[in-house]
Structures are given as structure tokens and as C-alpha cells.
């Protein structure tokens, strides 16, 4: 199965008890190769396909689902696609999560 890393626990402000954070999954080379192959065939999984991958790879369905979500998000970010609502809000000057420096008029420097 996948290896997981130890987690440093942070204390939350309310009751001082450590917040449980799920450790990051370290996929094996074989698991990654299979996930990438499946993703190349289809960027979205059916429930049946997710269950089959879970059995084949020794991962939970949630781990597989999240891997696919993260992979889609990474591709979307790399391709520069913008959400239509984000574009509309940016046009109104209400939304800018860009890391490009801009002047006081919102023009790129």
C-alpha cells in the first residue's frame, strides 16, 4: 500500500487540542504509473472504475478520487483556463488572485 508521512500537529486556538490532519500519501511508482495511464484514457472516473482501481492499487476510493481532482486542477492551472465568474469579477476589479505584480490601476508592471 501507499506510504504516508508523519504529521506535525498544530494546536487550534479554541480548545488547545491538536488538529488532526491527514498525512500526505506517497504513491509508489507503480501506483502513479497506473493512475497516469488511467487519467490519459479518461480524466473522469466512473464509480465502477474507481472501485476497480482501489482494489488493484491498494488505495482507498477517496485517495483515487482526490488524485484525479488534483491532476485535473493542475492541468487547468497550467493551461491558464479561467472560471467565467472569476473573469467577470476580475473585469469589475473585485477578484484578482494573480501573482503578477500590478500598479494601482491594475495594469501589469
From Swiss-Prot:
It is found in: Nucleus. Keywords: Developmental protein, DNA-binding, Homeobox, Nucleus. GO terms for biological process: neuron differentiation. Transmembrane segments: none annotated. GO terms for cellular component: nucleus. CDD domains: homeodomain. Residues 20-79 bind DNA. Residues 1-27 are annotated as: Disordered. InterPro entries: Engrailed_Homeobox_TFs, HD, HD_engrailed, HD_metazoa, Homeobox-engrailed_C-terminal, Homeobox-engrailed_CS, Homeobox_CS, Homeodomain-like_sf. Residues 1-12 have a biased composition (Basic residues). GO terms for molecular function: DNA-binding transcription factor activity, RNA polymerase II-specific; RNA polymerase II cis-regulatory region sequence-specific DNA binding. The keyword DNA-binding applies. The keyword DNA-binding applies. Gene3D superfamilies: Homeodomain-like. PROSITE patterns: ENGRAILED (PS00033), HOMEOBOX_1 (PS00027), HOMEOBOX_2 (PS50071). Belongs to the engrailed homeobox family. This is Homeobox protein E30.
Amino acid at each position: 500500500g501507499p506510504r504516508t508521512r508523519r504529521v506535525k500537529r498544530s494546536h487550534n486556538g479554541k480548545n488547545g487540542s491538536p488538529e488532526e490532519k491527514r498525512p500526505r500519501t506517497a504513491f509508489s511508482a507503480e501506483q502513479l504509473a497506473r493512475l497516469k495511464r488511467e487519467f490519459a484514457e479518461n480524466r473522469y472516473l466512473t464509480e465502477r472504475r474507481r472501485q476497480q482501481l482501489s482494489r488493484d492499487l491498494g488505495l482507498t476510493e477517496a485517495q483515487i478520487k482526490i488524485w484525479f481532482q488534483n491532476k485535473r486542477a493542475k492541468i487547468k492551472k497550467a493551461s491558464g483556463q479561467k472560471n467565467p465568474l472569476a473573469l467577470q469579477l476580475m473585469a469589475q476589479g473585485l477578484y484578482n488572485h494573480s501573482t503578477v505584480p500590478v500598479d494601482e490601476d491594475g495594469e501589469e508592471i
